[in-house]
């Protein structure tokens, strides 16, 4: 029960993590109730409900000029959708193909394959909802798809980021363990990988539960738009959210990042201390490329968003206003690039993935690949037999 409570606590963190920006609106009257957005500050309008065509319309929120400028500016209506379009166009087919390879083309389910399959699944579950997010930003941050789809979009959006961090950490530790202990029992390792993967999915589900429970869409009459996860009433901000987000940044980002970096440093030391034949040198170079790719993902995708998240809520806590939210939006947008980088990680980690990806791009069926492998093996055996026969003949003639 204690662990469940902690998971719910972390969930409360995630739920206040995103938001948008850009447009203008009216100044707030002093008699109105304060309401604070997850990132933008607004106020609940208390006048009687407006009616349109005889149908009551629920009171909306008014926001300050800074928040309005973000919600209507080019940052959220041009830059963000362009990046999301790029991520969708690259991430959907690449992760779809990766998941297909891991599930249907890879026979041996090693721990690395299990972690990479889960990572590809997390990316795919996030990317498939991007058309809704792209449409939302292109239409001036106006959400027209209902409350339920907004909750699903936000839940999968944040769940993907933390899933990627945790599965990338597992993959890094597993790669180091393979180098240090190459003779370990593969079936036992695979069972452990399955258990760890299930635990990660359960943790992410618990963490994102509040995103599905709380109201995510807010109507802003001054702009005539309905925002999705961009404005939230102040009364829902229960407790010190800065501490929650700080805990999430330390527990789900900083600690896994340090663990990943440590695993790669030890991996390089181990490879350097081993005998450097041609095969070991290729393995070391591939490991270095993998390290560079993963570190680039952390520094570009995860570090800025988690750092600015903490700074943003610290400013809201201490100054009741945050002017770094536009930067946080950019960082959060860049965090989605991990869905494009992950397939390159699979390429560097797994030779089987490289072979299967090449065969898939060349439209070779499994049967065709098997025939080619049998033919190649037969040719190698024939050459070895011919070499043995010629050496035997030369021995006989010498006598």
From Swiss-Prot:
Disulfide-bond pairs as recorded: 150-228
Glycan-bearing residues: 33, 224
Taxonomic superkingdom: Eukaryota
* Gene3D superfamilies from the UniProt entry: Rhodopsin 7-helix transmembrane proteins
Signal peptide segment = 1-25
Q: Which GO terms describe its cellular component?
A: early endosome; plasma membrane; pseudopodium
Provide the membrane-side ranges marked Extracellular in the record.
39-73, 140-151, 214-237, 320-325
InterPro entries xrefs: GPCR_Rhodpsn (IPR000276), GPCR_Rhodpsn_7TM (IPR017452), Pro_rcpt_2 (IPR002281), Protea_act_rcpt (IPR003912)
Q: What PTM annotation applies here?
A: A proteolytic cleavage generates a new N-terminus that functions as a tethered ligand. Activating serine proteases include trypsin, mast cell tryptase, coagulation factors VII and Xa, myeloblastin/PRTN3 and membrane-type serine protease 1/ST14. Proposed subsequent cleavage by serine proteases is leading to receptor deactivation and include neutrophil elastase and cathepsin G. At least in part, implicated proteases are also shown to activate the receptor; the glycosylation status of the receptor is thought to contribute to the difference.
> Keyword Glycosyltransferase, does the record have it?
no
A GO biological process of this protein is:
positive regulation of JNK cascade
Q: Where is this site: Cleavage?
A: 38-39
Q: Tell me the residue ranges located in the Cytoplasmic compartment per UniProt.
A: 104-110, 180-185, 272-279, 350-399
What the record says about disrupting the gene is: Delayed onset of inflammation. Reduced progression of osteoarthritis, infectious colitis, allergic dermatitis and experimental autoimmune encephalomyelitis. Upon induced allergic and toxic contact dermatitis ear swelling responses, plasma extravasation and leuocyte adherence are significantly attenuated. Upon ovalbumin (OA) sensitization and following challenge infiltration of eosinophils and increase of eotaxin content in bronchoalveolar lavage fluid are abrogated.
Query: What topology does the record note for this protein and the membrane?
Result: Multi-pass membrane protein
Sequence intervals crossing the membrane? 74-103, 111-139, 152-179, 186-213, 238-271, 280-319, 326-349
Intracellular or extracellular location(s): Cell membrane
PROSITE patterns from the UniProt entry: G_PROTEIN_RECEP_F1_2
| Complex formation | Interacts with TLR4, COPS5 and TMED2. Interacts with GNAQ, GNA11, GNA12, GNA13 and GNA14.
Similarity annotation: Belongs to the G-protein coupled receptor 1 family.
Name assigned to this protein:
Proteinase-activated receptor 2
Source organism of this protein record: Mus musculus (Mouse)
What lineage, starting at the top, does this entry show? Eukaryota, Metazoa, Chordata, Craniata, Vertebrata
């Amino acid at each position: 029960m204690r662990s469940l409570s902690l998971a719910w606590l972390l969930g409360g963190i995630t739920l206040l993590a995103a938001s948008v920006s850009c447009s203008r609106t009216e100044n707030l009257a002093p008699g109105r109730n304060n309401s604070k957005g997850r990132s933008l500050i607004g106020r609940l309008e208390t006048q009687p409900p407006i009616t349109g065509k005889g149908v009551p319309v629920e009171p909306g929120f008014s926001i300050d000029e800074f928040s309005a400028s973000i919600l209507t500016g080019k940052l959220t209506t041009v830059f963000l959708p362009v990046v999301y379009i790029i991520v969708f166009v690259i991430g959907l087919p690449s992760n779809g193909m990766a998941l297909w390879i891991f599930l249907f083309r890879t026979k041996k389910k090693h721990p690395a394959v299990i972690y990479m399959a889960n990572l590809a699944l997390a990316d795919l579950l996030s990317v498939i909802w991007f058309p809704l997010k792209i449409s939302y930003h292109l239409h001036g941050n106006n959400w027209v798809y209902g409350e339920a789809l907004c909750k699903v979009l936000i839940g999968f959006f944040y769940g993907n980021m933390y899933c990627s961090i945790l599965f990338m950490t597992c993959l890094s530790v597993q790669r180091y363990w393979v180098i240090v202990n190459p003779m370990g029992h593969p079936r036992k390792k695979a069972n452990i990988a399955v258990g760890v993967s299930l635990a990660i999915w359960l943790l992410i589900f618990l963490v994102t539960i509040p995103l599905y429970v709380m109201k995510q869409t807010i109507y802003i009459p001054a702009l005539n738009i309905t925002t999705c996860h961009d404005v939230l009433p102040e009364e829902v901000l229960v407790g010190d959210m800065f501490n929650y987000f700080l805990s999430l940044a330390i527990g789900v980002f900083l600690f896994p990042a340090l663990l990943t970096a440590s695993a790669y440093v030890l991996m390089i030391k181990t490879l350097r201390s081993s005998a450097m034949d041609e095969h070991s040198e290729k393995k070391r170079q591939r490991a270095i490329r993998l390290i560079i790719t993963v570190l680039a993902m952390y520094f570009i995708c995860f570090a800025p968003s988690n750092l600015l998240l903490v700074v943003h809520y610290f400013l809201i806590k201490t100054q009741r206003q945050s002017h770094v939210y536009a930067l946080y939006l950019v960082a959060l947008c860049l965090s989605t690039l991990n869905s494009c980088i992950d397939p390159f990680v699979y390429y560097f980690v797994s030779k089987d993935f490289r072979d299967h990806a090449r065969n898939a791009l060349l439209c070779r069926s499994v049967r065709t690949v098997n025939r080619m492998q049998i033919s190649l093996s037969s040719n190698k055996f024939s050459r070895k037999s011919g070499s043995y026969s010629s050496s035997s003949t030369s021995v006989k003639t010498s006598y």
